Amino acid sequence: MNQWLAWQISGLGPSQGQLVWFLAFHEGAHGEKPGPSIIARYQNEVERLRSVLETHLASAPGGYVALGHLTIADLAILPWLKLSALAGPALKPFDQYPAVDAYIKKLDALPEVQAAYKKAVPPPQ
């Protein structure tokens, strides 16, 4: 479980956060568009990380990242997967990652996750 929590906090979160920053906010904050190599760097890394997750989930017991059941690692990963919508077409749609897509749908359907969504401001799409 700790491995997947570390994967999110050191990989997916920072890489996707940087991608979204450069796509959505950099120009407004700095008055210039980011170079294409910057976008490509983070785009490629996020897609690589999604592939790692896809490979793992395809054979993970119970369809969760660790221990065969819901853990804090799943709850740390899910918001970043959901927030990838902010990157728009810069990232492949989740239907190209069927195990990740099923994982998102599975977690979204959990009563605990639904309860958290009701408290979110604004609610996630």
Regions found by a protein language model. Name each.
Residues 1:
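Hydrophobic, well-structured mid-protein blocks that either form specific transmembrane helices
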Residues 4, 8-106:
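GST-like fold's C-terminal all-alpha helical module
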Residues 113-125:
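C-terminal helix/juxtamembrane-tail motif
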